[in-house]
């Protein structure tokens, strides 16, 4: 498949559709939802009706069957306006429905995916713990097998889990320790745990700096029993599932970074052409014009890197190195554009009613979530031959 720099008609239509939705449905509500730290049930359901749930899942399971670039463009367009709504869709697709589709057996796919592709429900990915972020081997959540009842018993907790504690949450994929490997490291496995399961407690977290209108939960598992067939993939496959899921998730975070950067650039260009000092628009001052030129250049570079990673993935080639580079670069370009945009807005950039202020806060998470910038540099260094 040749690498193309132009969008086909289907992709153009998708971009226009999501952009229109973001501008007309999300933008008018974004400030209020952020201020109230409110997860919007109605907006989430509308995004489901638009076809943004189950984007990469084939139609036989109720999904849209999009290629990966189309999904990434949809996330990008949402993030251009509001990081919170983009986070809901990105986490649900790459961390929720994605692992179910890629690693689930037929029974699991048919049981869960149809409702997760329509906006009826959300699914979360329980990986991070209070003492286990970048170091997944430090996990404490464990699962022991009760051979008599043919059930796994899960105990532990997870934290900062997107989409895990709201009215639409249907379940969580939980990574837990199921034994020890020959080398002494923890053996990790994944389990599908519906939210109504006895012993599961989900608490919505508040007081966030960013993504205040997305749902983030703290999860507790107290002798949670799930049947043997609730295991996702094979026993001991948890680390592989986690790593491959995060490879895909890095593209989602990169898309959010690219979208945020584009949104910040658009807002700043508009403001710079309207705001006057010394008798002319500030965009005519070299100090501002050159800043905008630098922002635009970095956005262009970020877009090309991310789209190349998507092309590699959907053409069946190794994409993991470029995914890590894209996540790293797009998140840092987002921070740069939000910061420079806020600086250009001056005092107005510090006021919450101006979207650039929200972009500035939202950008902070992108350098941390799904692998910090430091971890991305470590991953990249290994790919390029640093031993």
Identify the residue ranges that each predicted region occupies.
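Short, conserved phosphate-binding/catalytic loop or strand-edge motifs used
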Residues: 91-97
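A short core secondary-structure module
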Residues: 151-201
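Short Gly/Pro-enriched turn/cap motifs at secondary-structure boundaries
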Residues: 89, 131-134, 162-167, 180-182, ...
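Alpha-helical interface subdomain recognition
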Residues: 1-85, 91, 103-108, 115-120, ...
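Flexible, small-/acidic-enriched active-site or ligand-binding loops
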Residues: 138-140, 196-227
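Glycine-rich, charged/polar anion/phosphate-binding loops
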Residues: 126-129, 139, 157-161, 173-178, ...
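A short, Trp-centered hydrophobic/proline-enriched beta-strand micro-motif
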Residues: 119-127
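Flexible, glycine-rich active-site loops centered on histidine and acidic residues
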Residues: 97-103, 125, 137
């Amino acid at each position: 498949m040749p690498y193309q720099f132009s969008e086909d008609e289907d992709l153009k239509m998708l971009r226009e559709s999501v952009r229109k939705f973001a501008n007309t449905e999300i933008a008018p509500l974004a400030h209020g939802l952020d201020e109230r730290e409110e997860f919007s049930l109605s907006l989430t359901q509308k995004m489901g009706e638009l076809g943004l749930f189950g984007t990469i899942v084939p139609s036989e399971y109720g999904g849209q069957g999009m290629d990966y670039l189309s999904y990434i463009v949809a996330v990008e367009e949402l993030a251009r306006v509001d990081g919170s709504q983009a986070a809901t869709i990105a986490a649900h697709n790459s961390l929720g429905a994605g692992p179910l589709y890629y690693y689930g057996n037929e029974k699991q796919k048919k049981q869960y995916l149809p409702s997760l592709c329509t906006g009826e429900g959300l699914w979360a990915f329980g990986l991070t713990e209070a003492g286990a972020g970048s170091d997944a081997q430090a996990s404490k959540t464990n699962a022991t097998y009760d051979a008599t009842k043919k059930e796994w018993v899960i105990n532990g907790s997870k934290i900062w889990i997107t989409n895990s504690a709201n009215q639409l949450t249907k379940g969580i994929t939980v990574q837990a320790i199921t034994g020890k490997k020959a080398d002494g490291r923890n053996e990790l496995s994944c389990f599908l745990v519906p939210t109504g399961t006895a012993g599961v407690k989900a608490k919505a977290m508040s007081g966030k700096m960013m993504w205040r209108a997305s749902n983030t939960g703290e999860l507790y598992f107290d002798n949670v029993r799930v049947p043997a067939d609730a295991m996702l993939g094979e026993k001991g496959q948890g680390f592989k599932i986690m790593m491959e899921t995060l490879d895909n998730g890095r593209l989602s975070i990169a898309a959010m970074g690219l979208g945020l950067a584009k949104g910040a650039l658009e807002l700043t260009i508009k403001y710079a052409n309207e705001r006057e000092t010394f008798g002319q628009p500030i965009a005519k001052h070299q100090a501002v014009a050159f800043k905008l030129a630098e922002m635009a250049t970095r956005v262009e570079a970020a877009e090309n890197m991310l789209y190349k990673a998507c092309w590699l993935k959907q053409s069946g080639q190794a994409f993991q190195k470029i995914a890590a580079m894209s996540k790293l670069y797009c998140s840092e370009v987002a921070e740069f554009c939000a910061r420079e945009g806020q600086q250009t807005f001056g005092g107005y950039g510090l006021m919450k009613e101006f979207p650039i202020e929200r972009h500035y806060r939202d950008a902070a998470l992108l350098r941390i979530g799904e692998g910090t910038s430091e971890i991305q540099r470590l991953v990249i260094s290994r790919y390029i031959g640093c031993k």
